[in-house]
């Protein structure tokens, strides 16, 4: 999950997936490095770059923001080397509210595409375009399995 490892994949002539949710940075520089270094091989005749990102869709933006609170609170706590889970949305929201002036919060909020189905789909399309990705992998997040499944259904159904 770096431009260097992406270039290595390109030199090997294989496909490449850039995991934004691990690297905590946009995939564009890595997909560009991959494409620039790509050499055809027995595996691939042409480059194929994918980006893996986090998304959460709900019926409304407000509901999606509410459902994203545990993920975001956990990510912010993780930046302080505090590994913790937030058992309720309310506890997570309280944690975020108490840290609303934390200068790292905007970066945490930007790590995932969160909103209504139409907003998330537009965000995913924009991400693919900006990154030069042939394909996106969506890591569905949410406080329950049902929430994650519903999110993917909403994204697919738009």
Annotate each PLM feature:
Residues 29-37, 145-158:
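C-terminal helical cap(s) of enzyme catalytic domains, especially alpha/beta-barrels
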Residues 2-6, 24, 61, 117, ...:
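Residues at or immediately preceding the N-termini of alpha-helices
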Residues 14-19, 47-54, 134-139:
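Hydrophobic faces of well-ordered beta-strands that scaffold small-molecule active sites
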Residues 2-25, 30-31:
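A conserved active-site cap/scaffold subdomain adjacent to cofactor or substrate pockets
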């Amino acid at each position: 999950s770096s431009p260097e490892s992406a270039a290595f994949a390109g030199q090997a002539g294989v496909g490449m997936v850039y995991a934004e949710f691990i690297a905590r940075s946009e995939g564009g520089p890595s997909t560009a490095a991959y494409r620039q270094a790509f050499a055809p091989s027995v595996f691939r005749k042409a480059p194929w770059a994918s980006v893996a990102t986090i998304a959460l869709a709900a019926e409304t933006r407000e509901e999606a923001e509410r459902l994203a609170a545990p993920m975001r609170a956990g990510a912010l706590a993780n930046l302080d080397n505090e590994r913790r889970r937030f058992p309720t949305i309310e506890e997570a929201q309280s944690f975020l509210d108490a840290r609303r002036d934390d200068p790292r919060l905007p970066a945490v909020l930007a790590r995932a595409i969160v909103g209504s189905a139409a907003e998330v789909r537009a965000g995913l399309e924009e991400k693919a375009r900006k990154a030069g990705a042939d394909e996106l992998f969506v890591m569905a997040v949410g406080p329950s399995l049902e929430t994650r499944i519903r999110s993917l259904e909403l994204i697919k159904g738009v």
